[in-house]
């Protein structure tokens, strides 16, 4: 699997980042199988969060075996220093490790939350202490709304975050405002040499009222290989600034994303976009976020 430099952190991360939200509601056997599937495919970057149900608890038992083989990132969604400090320590306990490579400020989706994170007594102060004490290697910021790129750009102005995790897919790119905000974020990231990672690549639309939720994701994902491959090719082949993309929060979709990464080589971003344009119900999942 292709690897890309994780900004100034220097790690050569696999372009597919294991999105451990997929482990939040599964048992240990299913988690172990999915983790092994990722490792066998060459995925060496794992991304989890304290808020992902039991995900940290599912990863923890594997750390003795794999910790020195992976880049390990987690997140805290707490907004005060005390709450975040407690949660960072709990994450280390649950992950059965004394250090993570990256702690991220989770779901910073608007300026109100950014103010809480970066203000006096905010969670960023806890992350800085954790870095000073060797508990974390770096500090990042994440979020998933239509406003995320502009909020994350402002976040970089306030603090020298080592990484940004923000949404990007073909449908979002067709919104002129989103495209402009994303382009401005890219320039800010390049200026600071931060890592730029993405989420929601295979998000197709929101679940409709009464629709069977066939997957654990809060949105309806692409699950046809043709479209998963097109979405992957559009993003990775057309966006060299992206260091990696998080796989969807559903273990049953991991193999399709692995196949897509392998098969994307001969598909140009333009041809990939043409394939995605075939999808009549392809829409932004941020119009009505159910979480």
Q: What label would you give each PLM region?
A:
Residues 1-70, 126:
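N-terminal binding-site loop/beta-alpha segment at the start of enzyme catalytic domains
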Residues 6, 18, 46, 59, ...:
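Conserved, mostly hydrophobic/aromatic
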Residues 7-10, 40, 59-68, 89-98, ...:
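Acidic (Asp/Glu)-rich catalytic clusters
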Residues 14-15, 67-70, 98-102, 137-138:
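Short acidic capping loops at alpha-helix termini that bridge into adjacent secondary structure
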Residues 26-38, 81-96, 146-156, 226-234:
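Short, acidic/polar
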Residues 54, 108-291:
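Beta/alpha (TIM)-barrel catalytic core signal, keyed to glycine-rich beta->alpha loops juxtaposed to Asp/Glu
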Residues 69-80, 102-106, 166-170:
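A short, structured active-site edge motif that brings together acidic residues
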Residues 92-115:
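Active-site groove signature of glycoside hydrolases
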